[in-house]
Amino acid sequence: MRMDKLTSRFQNALADAQSLAVGRDHTIIEPVHVFSALLDQQGGSTRPLLMQAGVNVPLLRERLTEILEALPKVSGQTVNVSPSNELSRLFHRTDKLAQQHGDQFMASEWFVLAVVDDSGGLGQALRAAGAEKKKIEAAIDKLRGGETVQTENAEEQRQALEKYTIDLTARAESGKLDPVIGRDEEIRRTIQVLQRRTKNNPVLIGEPGVGKTAIVEGLAQRIVNGEVPEGLRSKRLLSLDLGALIAGAKFRGEFEERLKGVLNDLAKNEGRVILFIDELHTMVGAGKADGAMDAGNMLKPALARGELHCIGATTLDEYRKYIEKDAALERRFQKVFVGEPTVEDTIAILRGLKEKYALHHGVEITDPAIVAAATLSNRYITDRQLPDKAIDLMDEAASRIRMEIDSKPEELDRLERRLIQLKIQREMLKKEKDEASKQRLADLERDIEVLDREFSDLEEVWRSEKAALQGATKIKESIEQAKLDLEAAQRRQDYAKMSEIQYGVLPALEKQLVAASQAEQHDFTLVQEKVTAEEIAEVVSRWTGIPVSKMLEGERDKLLRMEADLGRRVVGQEEAIKVVSDAVRRSRTGLSDPNRPSGSFLFLGPTGVGKTELCKALAEFLFDSQDAMVRIDMSEFMEKHSVARLIGAPPGYVGYEEGGYLTELVRRRPYSLILLDEVEKAHSDVFNILLQVLDDGRLTDGQGRTVDFRNTVIVMTSNLGSHQIQELSGDDSPEVYTQMKAAVMEVVQAHFRPEFINRLDDIVVFHPLDKAQIKQIARIQLQGLEKRLAESELKLDLDDRALELLGNVGFDPVYGARPLKRAIQSQLENPLAQQILAEAFVSGDTVQVGVDGGKLVFAKV
């Protein structure tokens, strides 16, 4: 017998049989070794063949083990194993059967048939397990499908559809697919294309997350329920598993063989199967090697002949990039565009999916949560599509509630930690013998007893609440299963089963659920089991950093006293503070225009009056950190070509993949304050980019992605008109300020285009600072010095005369508050640093600062 005349599967089984014989200390390979190896072979056809023929495989497995145990063993020396005479005889019989059926190679099924016909112990065991020659022959005919074995790998190509596809109709029958709500137009269009005589292969095209795969799942459910035209009623919908097709294809041609096997099986089914290829673009180039044919080219003939009835799905970008380039492949498919559903449609979809998600997480999802998931995801998550992003929000919010149910409540956890702490103290006090320690131990025992009782009561409440929730969840699962059984009975037209479920099982379960729900009616103290709009808003806030959640009382008060908080840091600019505060309040209460930035301002005024400082104060107020402010120095964008740095270089230029400076910062932090400092120094083309941001709250970067600016506050600062402000400064009357603002606006209108100025929410002209305000600023700036000294455990005490001196030295109507910083450095910080180095002041001292002879003097208190 020639080994090279066996199929590769049969050769592997023979090698496994040899290993089995060696492992059991047998010197001869008997037919039972080979049969055991064939039965245990991963992906082999022997076990499915026997099951098809009605053989009791577990019983056969037991008989084979008994025969193996009864074989003689040789131990103590290494011997060569060799095939027995009986095995050689069976192989000759197998070879004869293969030749009779026109096979070039011996396949494992002929060995099984030879064993059934044999009078030996193995044949008797097989027949005892229920094997009959006629049934085995019928099963072989069905397995082979009229084909002969002409290649070594012929066995591996069998049952290709079972190996490399997922049966969506079977999954729909067993209720494993989520319900598909809406999308009737797209499903109808898909059915329409499938019913065509030629080019009956639809390809679903749409953005990621709009529900292309869901449409195919909806079609599978309609086929199962018989809600399709006559031509599609008996068809199976299979999804191609490209990963399984490629995995393990080590040698050249192996992938092509597998795909050919799938196509052959489809041809045999004669149009009874529709193949769904998700991510269709992956077929173009799959398996491509030097000189080899890729999967896309292998599909073309089958598509042209009509042997392959196919539905594809891919995104718009990938369709353009891969499919449109291959005109021959593109013309064999008919496009079906899948658009993003509206918010109303998304709400309907979520309502349909609600039960599945509620059952999975064991929580209750309220209707306001569903509406919030659709509306908030549409407004705040702009880089993804509905309904995918709304479903994700609902899923994550439910997961969060489930996690809180399963973990210990905070109150219980705090009590447990306190108990552990007290018990550790008790163990320590037990070692002490004095009376005071004994008294403390007695007090501690009482405290532990009280806390223990409180902890036990709370734990009991928590466990009972949790058990009540779990009971309701189990009943809901039973109801869901009963509904699936009812649908299955309806398809089988089993009316007895239908009436039993509909009028017996379901009403009883629903009665149990009502009873369980009534038990839950009392408010849970420790466990929350409802997903509300507030939970959805919190998830949105976590994802985007945008404060969407309901304002707490503390935040309301904070926003109402915003002017006072900002005024403590920015002195003398009440109008600017009021304008900015109003914009923030509009944004947080949801009254601002949803299609524009929260606020866009142009701050004008001379240097050093607090334009940039107000932005820093605002960033700290909103985000508790100055780092949340996106500061862009516009003097860096004076050249025409530097505009590309803001939105990213165009294709073909260096840095294309890196994205733009402004767009990337806002994509990462959509809720931020953008400060465009010294805006008048930028090139005029920069303002053309800003027009889009100020009007629509969006900007398209160099890679074509839309960046959302609707939750940002945009502040531009400029020194334009500072000369006019200086000329008219000194008199702080409203008339002079109005005159000054008009003069400044003339300069601004001469520099900026009307369409730019017209898009701004407000243009604020800052007031020049007077001496009294400089003194206030000196007090604010000295707070920073006091903090730095506190790190060295030193205190600072300035009298009014010292503060007056610093204010006088630091006052300059032209330069604003900046000279004050220099005055504090030269008059106070420099001499104080020398005194500290000379150890005139050490840790714990208070530095008293006074004035003597027009200079600051230092004394230790």
From Swiss-Prot:
Record flagged with keyword S-adenosyl-L-methionine: no
Pfam families found in the cross-reference section: AAA (PF00004), AAA_2 (PF07724), AAA_lid_9 (PF17871), Clp_N (PF02861), ClpB_D2-small (PF10431)
A Gene Ontology cellular-component term: cytoplasm
Chain residues that bind ATP 1: 206-213
Covalent S-S links between cysteines: none
UniProt: ATP 2 binding residues: 605-612
Assembly, per entry: Homohexamer. The oligomerization is ATP-dependent.
Similarity annotation: Belongs to the ClpA/ClpB family.
Name of protein: Chaperone protein ClpB
Organism of this sequence: Xylella fastidiosa (strain 9a5c)
